[in-house]
Amino acid sequence: QVFEKQFKKLNPGHEGEYLQVFKDIKKELNDDDLGRGFYNRLKSVSPVKLIDFENIKNNVFHFTAEFTCKNGQDEFRPDITLFVNGLPLCFVEVKKPNNHGGMVAESSRMNRERFPNKKFRRFINITQLMIFSNNMEYDALGGIVPIQGAFYCTGARSSAPFNCFREDNISQQKIAPFHQDYVYKDIN
């Protein structure tokens, strides 16, 4: 419903193509290309666009908890799924601080169970960013193994490394420009 409405809004003169584009996307998501076909469609603006990158306010953003990704008997439910114009483009897995196994367990689950499972291919192909956090300071054993903190990865066939979110202070200022310009607000 959201996808259809946004497609028609962003593509005047192409409203009648909505259903065919939707079918094409569903087909592309089953391809064994790590989502390359879908990504190319996503960033394209011709002949139709799925996201308005020029005017972000023309897009609709939603999120939900425990969105089920199911194919046959196989399923997984990311803790949080983020949607842009009705497309589930990002998911977030959040763990309790000091959870057993830390982020190593989550990395293993993704790399051993989800990425290699062909039934999950369509979900991995549409997901542009995966975020994992246990709301703790970084500990990555010298950058080798993600133990705790917030990490991200993108789709893979069998194994994707977890990467740290870092804002470099290239100018060596007392307060990094990112933190100065975008002050974090207390959520308590």
Annotate the PLM regions.
Residues 1-188:
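An alpha-helical interface "stripe"
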